[in-house]
Amino acid sequence: MIGDFEIKDEDLAGRIGILETKHGKLETPAFFPVINPVKNEITIQDILSVGFESIITNAFLIKKYIGKEEDLHSILNYNKILMTDSGAYQILQYGDIDVSNVDIVNYETKLKPDIAVILDIPTGLTEDKKEAEKSVESTISRAKEASKFVELSKDEIIWVHPIQGGMYLDLIEYSARIADMNQDYKMLALGSPTVLMQRYEYAPLIDMIYKSKSNVSRGKPFHLFGGGHPHIFAFAVALGVDTFDSASYILYARDHRYMTRERVYRLEELDYFPCSCPICSRYSPKDVMEMPEEQKVRLIALHNLYVIKEEINYIKQSLKEGRLFEYIQQKAYSHPSTFEAFRRILNYSKYLEKYDPRVKGEVKGVFLFDNSSLHRPEVIRHAYTLSKIKQRSKALVLYCSDSKDNPLKNTEDMKNADVYIVLPFYGCVPYNVFFTYPYFQSEMPSTIDKDVIYDLKNKLKEFLSQRSYETVSIIGCEKILHVDSIRGAPVNLLLNKL
């Protein structure tokens, strides 16, 4: 059925899903390149050649400059997935447009896109909360106003309910809850983040995405308007964003800005292209610089599209392998703004753990690096698991080991005692589960970060204080904890050493 969304794979709060549309199945995460119906610097055929199977265009501009009231697929000579925006971006840019919500929604029903957006009122980055509240209420009102058109076209079009609120997280929460309750709309979208992304202000964007996603149904696909920089895709996907749209690829190209997955260069800065796409394999930066302006813009735009496509594919592969946390950890160090985004997303580690699958198909290694790895779902989940394990003996044996071989050779230590392995990042791991996932599959540096050691000592203190052991033995922990081995000692002796 049109609008059905099936989740195929999950990692953190991200997912690979299949959205059913009239013109085929859309696999998410997915990017919708913005097509300008008036300018043809990049053709739809160019976009298809890069590998995209979904585009977005502006119904307001179609109405204003083309005016045809017929199937937009025919107008554009395009038979794949098509989304229409309504003119809200023009409101954000120019303050108002000469068309009503009812007019544009009615026009969209005649264009018959696969996915369509009502004419909402963007909040933008206004500092006037009254204005922000007005934009939220107006958007909610317009969604209700459009319901009769939505109902009549629901078998052909997936309608999107925008979420507004700008920088006011309480308004975003309210807007998200109301949007989610309106069952006429099968897709949701966060509006107004474009300016933040243009400024590389990713940390507040993380807050906005979290606040909206944590207050809507998991089963509805979620769109991020204006999400066009490879910098931010992985962080947004980790929080549960499914689709993006942007004209960034062409806007950057007009300014001779060359995207990579880590940063943006100006063409004149480059002696070599750090890319092997068909454009960069054929030309050098000098070649492109010497081309006529129109050709130069076209080639940079095509390259930018290849980079966006590559990033989306890399995110999907990381998600499929259960390595999305490691990937955003890696992305964090590509730019100070992504580092801020990563630090901000760690504030929501419990939310990420909530949706992260406990077990995936093929077991992969768990790579642990520094104190940021303490926020991984596997590590957070261990604390809950440990709290459920009951004390069975009066004696406790703690063992530190750098080896994945059997860490306890001396079975005498194990008699009549509860036995735990002291494992950096996790804390105390029951011996009988040490050889299971994720503990045995965890890979970590031979020299452990001092913040991780500090955390490990605190976890050990907490573990000891929550139980009533009479004696404790600690073995082989000189290197990790800087504590000499002791056997059968009072618990307070170890606590004093920690």
Swiss-Prot record:
<dbReference type="GO" id="GO:0005737">
    <property type="term" value="C:cytoplasm"/>
</dbReference>
<dbReference type="InterPro" id="IPR050076">
    <property type="entry name" value="ArchSynthase1/Queuine_TRR"/>
</dbReference>
<dbReference type="InterPro" id="IPR002616">
    <property type="entry name" value="tRNA_ribo_trans-like"/>
</dbReference>
<comment type="pathway">
    <text>tRNA modification; archaeosine-tRNA biosynthesis.</text>
</comment>
<comment type="similarity">
    <text>Belongs to the archaeosine tRNA-ribosyltransferase family.</text>
</comment>
<feature type="binding site">
    <location>
        <position position="280"/>
    </location>
    <ligand>
        <name>Zn(2+)</name>
    </ligand>
</feature>
<keyword id="KW-0328">Glycosyltransferase</keyword>
<feature type="binding site">
    <location>
        <position position="277"/>
    </location>
    <ligand>
        <name>Zn(2+)</name>
    </ligand>
</feature>
<feature type="active site" description="Nucleophile">
    <location>
        <position position="85"/>
    </location>
</feature>
<dbReference type="InterPro" id="IPR004804">
    <property type="entry name" value="TgtA"/>
</dbReference>
<keyword id="KW-0819">tRNA processing</keyword>
<feature type="binding site">
    <location>
        <position position="275"/>
    </location>
    <ligand>
        <name>Zn(2+)</name>
    </ligand>
</feature>
<keyword id="KW-0862">Zinc</keyword>
<feature type="binding site">
    <location>
        <position position="120"/>
    </location>
    <ligand>
        <name>substrate</name>
    </ligand>
</feature>
<dbReference type="GO" id="GO:0016763">
    <property type="term" value="F:pentosyltransferase activity"/>
</dbReference>
<keyword id="KW-0808">Transferase</keyword>
<keyword id="KW-0479">Metal-binding</keyword>
<dbReference type="GO" id="GO:0008270">
    <property type="term" value="F:zinc ion binding"/>
</dbReference>
<protein>
    <recommendedName>
        <fullName>tRNA-guanine(15) transglycosylase</fullName>
        <ecNumber>2.4.2.48</ecNumber>
    </recommendedName>
</protein>
<comment type="function">
    <text>Exchanges the guanine residue with 7-cyano-7-deazaguanine (preQ0) at position 15 in the dihydrouridine loop (D-loop) of archaeal tRNAs.</text>
</comment>
<dbReference type="GO" id="GO:0002099">
    <property type="term" value="P:tRNA wobble guanine modification"/>
</dbReference>
<dbReference type="Pfam" id="PF01702">
    <property type="entry name" value="TGT"/>
</dbReference>
<dbReference type="InterPro" id="IPR036511">
    <property type="entry name" value="TGT-like_sf"/>
</dbReference>
